[in-house]
Amino acid sequence: MTKAEEFDKARRLAYKGDFSLVEKLYHPDCKHFDHRVGLEVNLDMQSALMTAYENTTFGPYRVIYENEDFLCIQRYGRNRLTREILYMTLISGVNYRDEKIVRHETAIEYLDYDPSEGQEWNWDDYE
C-alpha cells in the first residue's frame, strides 16, 4: 500500500471512530496544526477533533507529491450536517520519519459547486 492509500484509509476509518490504523501510522509525538481552532495539537487532541467530520463523506483523493519523507494529497469532502450541503477540497501535507507520520497539516477550502458533477465518480461510491 502506498503512503497515500494508507493515509486515506486511516483517515476514513478514524472519521468513523476506528483509530487502529492511525495508531499504527502516526508517531506518538506527531504534531498537527488545526486551522479550525488555530492551534498545534498532539495526536490525542487531533483524534478528538476528527469526530467533527462524522457527517462528512470523503470522495476520491489525488496525490500531488509522494516520497519516503513527505506526502501531499488532495481530497474532496461533502458535509450534510447543515440544511445546505457543503462541499470542500482539502490539501494535506504529511511529514514522515522512520515510516511514521510526525507532522500533518490540512488546509480546507469550501467550494460553491459539487466537485462530483461531470466526473466519473459520485458520492454514493464513498458512503
Go through each PLM region and give its residues:
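C-terminal and inter-domain tail/linker signature
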Residues: M1-E127
